Structures are given as structure tokens and as C-alpha cells.
Design a protein with these regions (language model features):
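Short, well-formed alpha-helical segments that are part of the catalytic scaffolds
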Residues: 15-31
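Acidic donor-binding segment of Leloir-type glycosyltransferases
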Residues: 26-68
Length: 143
């Protein structure tokens, strides 16, 4: 694989199902108008009682890399630094919360922004689905 244009670092802790949904939304089969060689996805998971399933990890696309780490503290800072050290892309994107799904054109649009200005600071807004914020979903009956 040639050097990708973009490295997307995803940090996860104790959210195996949500992290898998995030990864599916970043997959080349879901993203539009980009090739797998255009970007890589680096998942850094801090060990918890619910780590990602081995079969799910094995099914990740070829432009995905997975790292399971043992961290003493609760801060994601060490995982973020580790992810940056692994990144091979010319540009780097960071998803600190591994429970975020992205739209099918997000990688294309991020790459387009960097093609206009390689010093761009690109931010993708987050939205909650439903009437309530995500952190209250279980108390309101969402699963």
C-alpha cells in the first residue's frame, strides 16, 4: 500500500458494538468516491471488559489497522499519541469518541478540503439521532 493521503485515528474504550458501527461507516464499501488506498483507519482500543470481537477485527478492510492497548489511567491521551505515531497519512483525522458514525461522503469531503489548502483545519460536526442526546439514550428507551 502506498502512503495514504489521510489517516483517521479512532479511539475506543468499552464500546465494542458502537466502535464496530463507527468502523463500518468509515469502510471503503460505505464511503463514496474514494479508494481504500486514499486513506487508512487506525483503531486504538484501550482494554476494557468489552473489547472488540476477534472475528469483527479479522473482517476489517485492508486499509484498517487495530491496536489493543493496556492503559493504567482513564485518559485517552496515551492512545491518541500512540495512534499519531502509527499514522502514515499526509493528513490526520482524530475521532476521540469511537461511538460516532459518519456520512458516506465524509472522507471524500475531507480530502477535498485538504486539496484546496493543505493547511486546512477540517472539523466534522456531530449530531444525535432522535429527540434526546446520546448520553441519555438508555434512560429514554433507546438501545
Amino acid at each position: 500500500m502506498n502512503r495514504p493521503l489521510l489517516s483517521v485515528i479512532v479511539i475506543a474504550y468499552d464500546m465494542s458494538r458502537q466502535a464496530l458501527n463507527t468502523l463500518k461507516s468509515l469502510a471503503p464499501s460505505y464511503q463514496q468516491n474514494v479508494n481504500a488506498d486514499d486513506y487508512e483507519v487506525i483503531l486504538v482500543e484501550n482494554r476494557s471488559r468489552r473489547v472488540m470481537d476477534a472475528a469483527a477485527i479479522a473482517s476489517l478492510p485492508g486499509n484498517f489497522r487495530y491496536f489493543l492497548r493496556d492503559e493504567a489511567g482513564v485518559s485517552p491521551a496515551a492512545a491518541i499519541n500512540f495512534g499519531f505515531a502509527q499514522a502514515q497519512g499526509q493528513f490526520i483525522g482524530l475521532m476521540i469518541d469511537g461511538a460516532r458514525m459518519v456520512t458516506p461522503g465524509v472522507i471524500e469531503n475531507v480530502l477535498m478540503a485538504f486539496s484546496l489548502n493543505e493547511n486546512a483545519m477540517v472539523c466534522v460536526p456531530g449530531y444525535n439521532l432522535g429527540e434526546h442526546e446520546q448520553q441519555f439514550h438508555r434512560s429514554k428507551g433507546y438501545t
